[in-house]
Amino acid sequence: GLGNNAFVGVR
């Protein structure tokens, strides 16, 4: 999603 991009980077 929009802000989810950052979360994906952490994963």
From Swiss-Prot:
Keywords: Amidation, Neuropeptide, Secreted. One of its GO terms (biological process) is neuropeptide signaling pathway. GO terms for cellular component: extracellular region. It comes from the Eukaryota. It is found in: Secreted. The modification Arginine amide is found at R11. The keyword Secreted applies. Myoactive peptide. This is Callitachykinin-2.
